[in-house]
Regions:
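Von Willebrand factor
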Residues: 141-176, 188-190, 210
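Von Willebrand factor type A / integrin I
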Residues: 1-33, 42, 51, 170-174, ...
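Short, contiguous clusters of charged residues that form electrostatic/catalytic patches at enzyme active sites
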Residues: 104, 108, 159-166, 255, ...
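Short, glycine/charged-enriched secondary-structure capping and boundary segments
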Residues: 71-72, 95-97, 137-138, 193-195, ...
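Short, electropositive alpha-helical surface patch
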Residues: 132-147, 259, 286-287
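An amphipathic, basic-hydrophobic helix/alpha-beta surface used to engage anionic
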Residues: 1-130, 135, 177-180, 187-188, ...
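Conserved phosphate-coordination/catalytic loops
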Residues: 100, 155-162, 248-251
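Short, flexible loop segments at the rims of nucleotide/cofactor-binding pockets, characterized by
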Residues: 58, 154-158, 181-182
């Protein structure tokens, strides 16, 4: 993409998503994604009803009267965006590709995070770790992330979600909130890796999919291509049975995916490219409150 065109696209996404994060998501984000725990704030004299476990014995000995430690919520988070950049993200049948919706969702989450003084890091993955952007704060960092979301070209086309989750578990030492954004078209299982990752971190799954992935149009003979393997085949979509088999396959796949999220205790939302992702994200945030 030409530099001028890229910068124009970055600016368009910035205007749209920053406004959403500021005007719509600010309150929901803050309450839905709380801090990592309690951090020490100050000491004060002991008052009736205080927990004796909070007594600061050093200060108490110095002043010969009891003092307690006061704690407050440690609000600052580290937010990681795990972005699927495999070949299937370039699919789209209703004027918008999955890649574009993923970019806007990621940018909205990123702006929401920095407005809450959180740090943002990004991991691009296919069936390997394509790129890692260390966590930082600030608008300049977010604009760099958006540029990468728009223009990044992966080395591989296939998907391995488990690989990305293992990297998250091993490489990110401090607990974080991790948004896993993908279409979840992955021939390999990721349930075990998700279970382990969610024990250490707070993983949230966001599925982005296209309507044409859920059912076939009745248009007769059509050639379909696997965007990740490059394999092609002809099918007769005018056949009711062919369309039913395909739809059943999709529904089974969704059921397995949602069952994995449920068993791993991972909050999730599925967003169709033509639908309003704002409403879907608000519903996700509300579910966590």
């Amino acid at each position: 993409m030409e530099t001028s065109e890229l910068l124009k696209k970055v600016r368009q996404i910035e205007i749209k998503t920053r406004g959403l994060s500021r005007n719509i998501f600010a309150g929901q984000y803050h309450s839905a994604f709380k801090g990592r725990g309690m951090a020490f704030s100050e000491v004060r004299e002991y008052q009736y009803g205080d927990d004796i476990r909070d007594i600061d014995w050093n200060v108490t000995a110095r002043y010969v009267r009891p003092y307690v430690k006061v704690f407050e919520e440690e609000r600052e988070l580290t937010v990681m965006l795990l972005i699927d950049v495999s070949g299937s993200r370039d699919f789209g049948s209703v004027n918008v590709m999955k890649k574009e919706v993923i970019t806007e969702i990621a940018a909205t989450l990123a702006f929401s995070a920095i407005q809450n003084n959180d740090k943002i890091g990004v991991l691009f993955f296919s069936d390997r770790i394509e790129k890692f952007i260390p966590r930082q704060k600030g608008k300049k960092h977010i604009l760099y992330v958006i540029r990468e979301l728009i223009d990044f070209q992966p080395e591989e086309k296939k998907t391995n979600i488990a690989q990305a989750l293992k990297y998250l578990t091993n490489a990110i030492k401090k607990r974080c909130t991790a948004f896993l954004i993908s279409d979840f078209i992955d021939k390999d299982g990721f349930k075990d890796a998700l279970t382990i990752a969610n024990r250490k971190h707070d993983v949230v799954a966001i599925q982005v999919y296209d309507r044409r992935e859920t059912e076939l149009p009745a248009v007769g003979l059509m050639k379909i291509k696997d965007a990740e393997t490059g394999q092609e085949r002809w099918i007769d979509s005018s056949s009711t049975r062919v369309r039913e088999v395909y739809k059943e396959w999709w529904e089974r796949r969704q059921a397995v995916m949602n069952d994995s999220f449920k068993k791993c205790r991972v909050d999730s939302v599925s967003i169709r490219t033509e639908d309003d992702y704002v409403k879907a994200l608000i519903a996700l945030f509300d579910k966590r409150n």
